[in-house]
UniProtKB/Swiss-Prot annotation:
UniProt-listed GO biological process terms: 'de novo' IMP biosynthetic process
Reactions mediated catalytically: N(1)-(5-phospho-beta-D-ribosyl)glycinamide + formate + ATP = N(2)-formyl-N(1)-(5-phospho-beta-D-ribosyl)glycinamide + ADP + phosphate + H(+)
EC number: 6.3.1.21
Protein name as it appears in the record: Formate-dependent phosphoribosylglycinamide formyltransferase
Residues reported in the UniProt entry to bind ATP: R114, K155, S160, S161, G162, K163, G164, Q165, E195, S196, F197, V198, E203
Length: 393
């Protein structure tokens, strides 16, 4: 039996999100629908998730003393990491002391850097991955480039949403890619991974939910990226039954190895019926924003249900759907959004404005979502809606 309380009272179940971006915002909303009291922690004020939370704290989550202080102050029932830049050693200690880290402190630690999860997937679980080498210095990086070969992909071991990531297509890109990897990652200069370029037909995100009743999968999500940063996604990604079965097998094996309950975003390359593991995050995935319109239970609702121990008897898809991001390309400390009415003129269309208080150059500020007759139609509808929105700087 699962008993839920009432926020703001002695019966409240308390959830603390470590990180408060647009994905965390949707998690907060879903948790509050079930009476959960939500606290958001991030490194700056007025993040999207803070705008809908009961309370918030501004700290560096890499500061072990500060992280421990806010956890011990609030004594949450669930600690839910949402970003990479967290003192994971402190989470391991807190878990040993009885706090519930979602999905587990070990899973959080392994997936917060690409080295931990790549070694788990390739060396322990036995999943096929691209050839890779790690490097701490430019000399090691140049040696790794020689061994892996060109073309290759360069990523900081601690980053997300394409930050610090680039593709080396020729010798002319080598120095630039190193410099960007050291300036663009979540935690500044540091260790990187050099990956061989993978020959694939398409890439998917397979949202995988570990819950009280077992493991469930959403329909596969296809997506398009620019320099590692998501721009469009669609669901379902057409694929053969054999390829889907292989993808689900990979997702099951890696999420079982990580353990705990919650939603995982498993990224896979598909070549014919062959599957190559890319990455996994133990939390909602940006490409999964499409599920806000495509499914009866969005990825955020699934995550919250799994965390709370609630049943997930089925995941129903409404039909082909797509998302298209709303991007800034200017500087503002108070961006506004014009023509939202035009974006929403078509039926089966939604617009989410994330609530990011400032932009300086290219930044995701929102997303348009649409259902369609098929995936191609849904993508066209989503792009029309996102293109209709004009950002005022």
């Amino acid at each position: 039996m699962v008993t839920l309380g009432t926020a703001g009272t002695a019966s409240a179940r308390k959830m603390m999100l470590l990180g408060g971006g647009e994905l965390g915002k949707e998690v907060v909303i879903e948790a509050q629908r079930l009476g959960v009291e939500v606290i958001v922690v991030d490194r700056y004020e007025n993040t999207p998730a803070m705008q809908v939370a009961h309370r918030s704290y501004v700290i560096s989550m890499l500061d072990t003393a500060e992280l421990r202080r806010v956890v011990e102050t609030e004594k949450p029932d669930y600690i839910v990491p949402e970003i990479e830049a967290i003192a994971t050693e402190t989470l391991l200690e807190l878990e040993k002391e009885g706090f519930n880290v979602v999905p587990t402190a070990r899973a959080t630690r392994l997936t917060m850097d690409r080295e931990g999860i790549r070694r788990l997937a390739a060396e322990e679980v036995g999943l096929k991955t691209s050839p890779y080498k790690f490097a701490d210095t430019k000399e090691e990086y140049l040696e790794a480039i020689k061994e892996i070969g060109i073309p290759c992909v360069i990523k900081p071991v601690m980053s997300s949403s394409g930050k610090g990531q680039s593709t080396v297509k020729s010798e002319a890109d080598v120095d630039r890619a190193w410099d960007y990897s050291q300036s663009g990652g979540r935690t500044g200069e540091g260790r990187i991974i050099v990956e061989s370029f993978v020959d694939f037909d398409y890439e998917i995100t397979l949202l995988t939910v570990r819950h009280a009743g077992g493991t469930s999968y959403c329909a596969p999500i296809g997506h398009r990226q620019d320099d590692g940063d998501y721009r469009e996604s669609w669901q379902p990604q057409p694929m053969s039954d054999a390829a889907l079965a292989n993808a689900q097998d990979y997702a099951l094996r890696i999420t079982d190895a990580l353990g705990g309950r919650g939603l995982f975003g498993v990224e896979l390359f598909i070549k014919g019926e062959e599957v190559i593991f890319s990455e996994v995050s133990p939390r909602p995935h940006d490409t999964g924003l499409v599920t806000v319109i495509s499914q009866d239970l969005s990825e955020f609702a699934l995550h919250v249900r799994a965390i709370l121990g609630l049943p997930i008897p089925a995941i129903r898809q409404y039909g082909p759907a797509a998302s298209s991001v709303i991007l800034s390309n200017g500087k503002s400390e108070a961006p506004a959004f014009a023509n939202v009415d035009k974006a929403l003129e078509a039926a089966d269309t939604k617009v989410l404005i994330f609530g990011k208080g400032e932009c300086n150059g290219v930044r995701r500020l929102g997303v348009a979502l649409a259902l369609g007759e098929d995936v191609t139609d849904a993508k066209a509808r989503a792009i029309r809606a996102s293109s209709a929105v004009e950002i005022e700087y």
